[in-house]
Amino acid sequence: MLSEKDTIVACSSPPGRGAISVIRLSGDKAFSIIQKITKNKLKKQISVVKFPLNADLIEKCVLTIFKAPNSYTGEDIVEISTHGNPYIVEEVIKKCLDSGAKIAKPGEFTLRAFLNNKLSVSYTHLRAHETPINL
């Protein structure tokens, strides 16, 4: 069951396809989760932060914040741009999960956008039929 109250996280970039991956965090707790992890206040729309992956590894990330309702989902969103290495992407997502986020189910960001009147029914039908061939 999908809950609109959960803050969700997922990688929005195709795995292993680029040097940079974007991890999206959406929901009421998106900002507080990132502040908890990075120990930074989100004062600017775009900022560079040190993202601790574990005791020995710190990743430098670019954070882009979108305040509700001015985001794709209509909720508060933090987009974390990080190196595309699958290990780093996985560790960033794990940190978000450990800090209170839930893993997003396929289509959940788009569903939230639709439920928050950010997308039309016809657009969501088009998104549901996208394939790597017609993108």
Task: List where the protein language model places each region.
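Single conserved hydrophobic/aromatic residue that forms the stacking wall/gate
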Residues: 125, 132-135
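A glycine-rich (often HGG/GG-containing) alpha/beta subdomain
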Residues: 1-127
